[in-house]
């Protein structure tokens, strides 16, 4: 789904929605009558809810003067903002606790998406809370359950505290708790902090942003994460007596596909819109692992392209890191060209399993493609793909949230300064408003001559 530019579906899926009214599931199986807990059902319920909220907004716009709270000292209608804060904190705590204790654990709900580090075995399943130090591992889904249960309890207790205890008068005045702009400023702070956090967890990866749903991170390419795992599996198979062809044939195509630079979210660009499939095309199949050897039988390895390069010289090195062959920029001065060194390429696993190519033009073609990781065949005709890499939803999510978090950070500073230094900006003490208001007193500023309404 991340290759197709799906943005909302991965978030639904990680919460346990896997079925569609179209009869398909995320795992490729067929289903019948998935009901409300489906992609379309969840989308429809949100559309209906948004409509109801819009109607509620109109109602409250019309009937805005609701006397829900009264100031006990003056008996005048007034918004009790600290009490409203306590109500919202309590309700959000209940929601947080309920999500962790019931939804994530599967006690009353489906659980969440859980997978292995290499994104191969992902499925929705119940998660047991991890209460020890292991719960702080960002890749441990048990920490998600434990955190929501713990944070929910804290939120419930804090909400009850703010419902039952009044803020000290000095603190109330210092933080301008009676001013609704204080609510705006502190709310913006909560939102931008959350946006920065989720931007980090999405870009660097964690249990809540599995690679099966959002695509790999750029650091997995930089560190050769999948390449090392593939090599480890192949070496284990060969050590067990399997041939190279058999060993590479046991590598899941999914794992090989992760080890391809086109899935690196940093390879796209902010000005290249559209899904990844509009770039290099729709992946049609793995051709196999390309192994290069020179005329002396020495195995050569193509140096892979770093993330932030659009073009990179084709260099083949041996096991000791010594350059043995290349595709030269100037053939007249070349010493290590494919033709001179006599390089051939053999494929293991995939569609070209067991085939060897000695033609220099073909060898150079696959050497260029091996720069980009495992070699895949792509269908570029269906979507008229232009061959220019696009970015995954992982990068777009990160960019959007960090950008808005930065804007909201300045918004928090702006509105916080406005509410705290309101008297400085206005030049008038806010408590003097009534005294200088025309018509409030028979004699301007004399509080003993309050004008009585008849």
From Swiss-Prot:
The lineage of its organism: Eukaryota, Viridiplantae, Chlorophyta, Mamiellophyceae, Mamiellales. One of the components of the core complex of photosystem II (PSII). It binds chlorophyll and helps catalyze the primary light-induced photochemical processes of PSII. PSII is a light-driven water:plastoquinone oxidoreductase, using light energy to abstract electrons from H(2)O, generating O(2) and a proton gradient subsequently used for ATP formation. It comes from the Eukaryota. GO terms for biological process: photosynthetic electron transport in photosystem II. GO terms for molecular function: chlorophyll binding; electron transporter, transferring electrons within the cyclic electron transport pathway of photosynthesis activity. Coiled coil: none annotated. PSII is composed of 1 copy each of membrane proteins PsbA, PsbB, PsbC, PsbD, PsbE, PsbF, PsbH, PsbI, PsbJ, PsbK, PsbL, PsbM, PsbT, PsbX, PsbY, PsbZ, Psb30/Ycf12, at least 3 peripheral proteins of the oxygen-evolving complex and a large number of cofactors. It forms dimeric complexes. One of its GO terms (cellular component) is photosystem II. This is Photosystem II CP47 reaction center protein. The keyword Lipoprotein does not apply. The gene is psbB.
């Amino acid at each position: 789904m991340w290759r197709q530019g799906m943005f909302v579906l991965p978030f639904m899926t990680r919460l346990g929605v896997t079925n569609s009214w179209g009869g398909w599931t995320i795992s490729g199986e067929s289903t019948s009558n998935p009901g409300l807990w489906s992609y379309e059902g969840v989308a429809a319920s949100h559309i209906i809810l948004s409509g109801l909220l819009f109607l509620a907004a109109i109602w409250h716009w019309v009937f805005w003067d609701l006397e829900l709270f009264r100031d006990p000292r003056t008996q005048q209608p007034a918004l009790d903002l600290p009490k409203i804060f306590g109500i919202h904190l309590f309700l959000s705590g209940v929601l947080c606790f309920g999500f962790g204790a019931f939804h994530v654990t599967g006690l009353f709900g489906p659980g969440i998406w859980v997978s292995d580090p290499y994104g191969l075995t992902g499925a929705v399943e119940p998660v047991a809370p991890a209460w020890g130090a292991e719960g702080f591992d960002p890749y441990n889904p048990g920490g998600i359950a434990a955190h929501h249960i713990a944070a929910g309890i804290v939120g419930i207790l804090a909400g009850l505290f703010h419902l039952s205890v009044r803020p000290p008068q000095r603190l109330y005045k210092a933080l301008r708790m009676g001013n609704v702009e204080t609510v705006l400023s502190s709310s913006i702070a909560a939102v931008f902090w959350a946006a920065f956090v989720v931007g980090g967890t999405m870009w660097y990866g964690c249990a809540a942003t599995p690679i099966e749903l959002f695509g790999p991170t750029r650091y997995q390419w930089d560190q050769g994460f999948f390449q090392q795992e593939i090599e480890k599996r192949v070496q284990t198979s060969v050590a067990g007596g399997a041939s190279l062809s058999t060993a590479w044939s046991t590598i899941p195509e999914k794992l090989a596909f992760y080890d391809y630079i086109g899935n690196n979210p940093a390879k796209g660009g902010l000005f290249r819109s559209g899904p990844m499939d509009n770039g290099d095309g729709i992946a049609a199949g793995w051709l196999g692992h390309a192994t290069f050897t020179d005329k002396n039988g020495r195995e050569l390895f193509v140096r892979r392209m770093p993330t932030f390069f659009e073009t990179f010289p084709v260099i083949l090195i041996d096991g000791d890191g010594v350059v043995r062959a290349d595709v030269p920029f100037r053939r007249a001065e070349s010493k290590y060209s494919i033709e001179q060194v006599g390089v051939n390429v053999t494929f293991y696993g995939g569609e070209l399993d067991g085939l060897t190519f000695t033609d220099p033009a073909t060898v150079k073609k696959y050497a260029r493609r091996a720069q980009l990781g495992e070699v895949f065949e792509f269908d570029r005709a269906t979507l008229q793909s232009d061959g220019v890499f696009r970015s995954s939803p992982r990068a777009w999510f990160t960019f959007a949230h960090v950008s808005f978090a930065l804007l909201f950070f300045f918004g928090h500073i702006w509105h916080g300064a406005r509410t705290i230094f309101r008297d400085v900006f206005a030049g008038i003490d806010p408590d003097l408003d009534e005294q200088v208001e025309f018509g409030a007193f028979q004699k301007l500023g004399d509080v003993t001559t309050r004008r009585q309404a008849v």
